[in-house]
Amino acid sequence: MGPAGLFAALELARAGLKPVILERGSNVDVRRRKVDHFWQTGELDPECNVQFGEGGAGTFSDGKLNTMVKDPSGRNRKVLECFVAHGAPEEILYMQKPHIGTDKLREVVRSIREEILALGATVHFDTRFVRLLLQGDRICGVEYEQAGRISQMACEAVILATGHSARDTFIELKEQGVVMQPKAFAVGVRMEHPQEMIGLSQYGEAAKILPPASYKLTNTTSDGRGVYSFCMCPGGQVVNASSECGRLVVNGMSEYARDGANANSAIVVTVGPEDFGEGLFDGMQFQRRLEQAAYEQGQGRIPVQLLGDFLQNRESTALGEV
């Protein structure tokens, strides 16, 4: 139940309907305990983690928002106002780069769910969508798994808000004849610096009295490929965001205060079918190969390397300032 599913359910419930929401992960409170356990022990729950659970991947990310000032329909403003009504800082309504923070976002997500339930909707956590039930060329229900049991639910309309990590769902949908096509995506590394360094670089001596500084970088390589920074997290941390056993993914997050010692940002490049193959799931398999290599390189932990060593393709023997 990421942002797409959450707001679809909210709009339907506000319109007087009673949607039934299936979320493969746990509610935000149980999910937080499971994620903390994973970070402390390395024991991954593939059904409830940084990717799956109430709020989606964003619950354990930075809580950054887009302003979409050119949004002609006003939908984005409505979303921001909804966040504020459910406990987000009012400043997100006017800040150039609005930010809720991981700590506050959990409370906001819980509050939105409570409104959805109060309007008559039903939410089933720890419940995995398995496949569509079809009668001819029409949907007549869904099959789902809950507590190890397969059940069915009749319905005439389904909104599949899968996010990007439910790979088993994509495979099942293909087998059922759902039309899909591969698309480009970004892949890269997380760069980490002392926040004080970024502040001095951006603000000089004024960094002492200004909010934590961020940065945005772009570059076009000699072969025309774009490289850019993404999801810069001032005063944040790099976290293990894996959702499949034996594979490793990282993400960055900041809490509302952004008062951590380090800053981090993704440095990514866009890749497409010309890089990983034209097959429908070639991009997905490309991701899995990278994730497995990262897992093996770090023996299940996040592999860390100095930037200079990374650029020279050599192993790091010591850490830097972070």
Named regions from a protein language model:
Residues M1-V322:
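Residues forming the flavin
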